[in-house]
A protein has these predicted regions:
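Short amphipathic helix-loop junctions that connect adjacent transmembrane helices
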Residues: 37-56, 251-267
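Helix-to-loop junctions at the C-terminal end of transmembrane segments
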Residues: 72-85, 282-296
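C-terminal membrane-cytosol helix-exit motif in multi-pass small-molecule transporters
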Residues: 197-217, 401-407
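C-terminal ends and interior cores of transmembrane alpha-helices
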Residues: 95-109, 306-319
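A late C-terminal transmembrane helix in Major Facilitator Superfamily
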Residues: 352-383
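Hydrophobic core of transmembrane alpha-helices in multi-pass small-molecule transporters
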Residues: 26, 112-128, 322-337
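Intracellular juxtamembrane helix-capping segments at the cytosolic ends
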Residues: 128-142, 337-350
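C-terminal transmembrane helical hairpin of 12-TM major facilitator-type secondary transporters
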Residues: 297-342
């Protein structure tokens, strides 16, 4: 009688551990969303005599510096976490994130260039959080509930972005009470920085006290073979394309508001809130229905691409603001449907390569955002609202690849299915 040796079961995450992991994603997203709207007025005080166009240029460059930090750091931190342990890299990333925020309170150390360095540094340390959290969740989650947990992580990021303006409101209220002659915008910005740092420090402490220190059992050679890089190249290209579309689409909304008097600032803000809420609803749908476990990922990606195409078409041809809202909803729903599929399929990587896989996806997303902002700004300057139609090109490319190269997506999906669930 032949005996069989059962593979050791991977320890599942406890609810408190999962909470702190999702909260870490929430905090870094909220910190970015809270500080970004305050940068123009804050920089005006840091650069005496600057013109509005100069301030706007620096705001764009600072956002680019942050994104560049994520782009460079994500694959590096992912690779290091696979070797040294994901828990310690995650905590180290939060320590660096909190430190880079607090140092913003001392811009006199080097003026404007110090702010540039600190924003790039913040992006570099956030890059240690973005890929490592999903890698930890994938490594310690049975496949049967993995899709739901990744939907939860996506929701945490979106909620963090929505929470950013709320953090600003709290800061404004506190600044009004404690101003004592200090300019309100300067004090409000400092309070946002301190609150963001406190939230980051709280998550850092919670993760240090609750996360597992071991990385789980070693994998068999079959699982390692199932994580061949070629299959995940398709996911990286998909991440670049979808993030390019999403970034260009969001920038197009902002520029549309600036060039058309009938579209108020409040309406533009409402469209951004609509975008986040629709994507949050899509994540809730994936969470409660476990759709990714029941339907071919290839079909989900195709459906999301078609929805986004419809939304961009409406935005390119709209005649009234009401049609703009419809276009925003459709585009948000489509991109919001595709993005969780990418992370879910990437979770099928070998446990030993989860960090570098998720890091590659984070870098691909940052590259797509950078390309989308650049292309979106140039296109809108050239053809205005028809830029939305040109942004549909990457989505057409996705649909063509889904038809002409179905083996890419079947191979990637099979790798996710082969990842250990017990």
């Amino acid at each position: 009688m032949r005996s069989t040796i059962k593979k050791p079961r991977e320890a599942d995450l406890r609810p408190l551990q999962l909470f702190f992991l999702a909260a870490a994603v929430f905090v870094v997203s909220a910190g970015y969303g809270a500080l970004l709207p305050l940068l123009p007025a804050w920089l005006s005080r840091q650069i005496p005599g600057s013109t509005p166009s100069e301030v706007a240029r620096h705001v764009g460059f600072l956002s680019g510096a942050y994104t560049a930090g994520v782009l460079i750091g994500a694959p590096i931190w992912g690779m290091i976490s696979d070797r040294l342990g994901r828990t310690r890299i995650l905590i180290f990333g939060l320590v660096g994130y909190v430190t880079s925020l607090l140092l913003l309170l001392l811009p006199s150390m080097g003026g404007l260039w110090t702010i540039y360095v600190l924003r790039a540094t913040a992006g570099l340390f956030v890059a240690a959080v973005v890929p490592v959290v999903p890698a930890l969740v994938a490594a310690h989650t049975p496949k049967a509930i993995r899709a739901r947990r990744f939907a939860w992580l996506g929701a945490a990021s979106l909620l963090g972005f929505l929470f950013g303006p709320g953090l600003n409101a709290v800061a404004d209220a506190l600044a009004a009470v404690f101003s004592n002659g200090v300019t309100l915008i300067a004090l409000s910005t400092r309070i946002v920085i301190v609150l963001s740092a406190l939230l980051g420090a709280s998550m850092m402490l919670g993760l240090a006290l609750t996360l597992p220190t071991h990385e789980g059992a070693a994998e068999s050679d079959d699982n390692l073979a199932a994580s061949a890089p070629a299959g995940f190249a398709a996911l990286w290209w998909l991440s670049i394309a979808v993030n390019l579309v999403l970034s260009g689409f969001e920038l197009g909304i902002v520029l549309q508001g600036r060039q058309h008097a009938e579209l108020s600032t409040q309406q533009v803000a409402l469209m951004f809130a609509e975008c986040s809420l629709v994507m949050l609803a899509i994540n809730a749908l994936l969470f409660f229905t476990a759709l990714l476990d029941k339907v071919s990922p290839r079909l989900v990606v195709a459906a999301g691409s078609l929805l986004a195409l419809a939304g961009l078409s409406v935005l390119a041809l709209h005649q009234t603001n009401e049609w703009m809202y419809i276009g925003v909803s459709l585009t948000s729903a489509g991109t919001g449907l595709v993005l969780p599929v990418i992370s879910f399929l990437a979770a099928g990587a070998s446990h030993r390569a989860l960090g570098v896989t998720m890091g590659g996806l984070a870098a691909a997303g940052a590259l797509g955002q950078t390309l989308g902002s650049t292309a979106g700004g140039w296109l809108f300057g050239a053809v205005e609202r028809l830029s939305f139609a040109w942004l549909a090109a990457p989505l057409f490319a996705i649909l063509i690849l889904l038809v002409l190269r179905p083996s890419w997506w079947r191979a990637t999906a099979s790798r996710a299915a082969l990842s250990p669930s017990h």
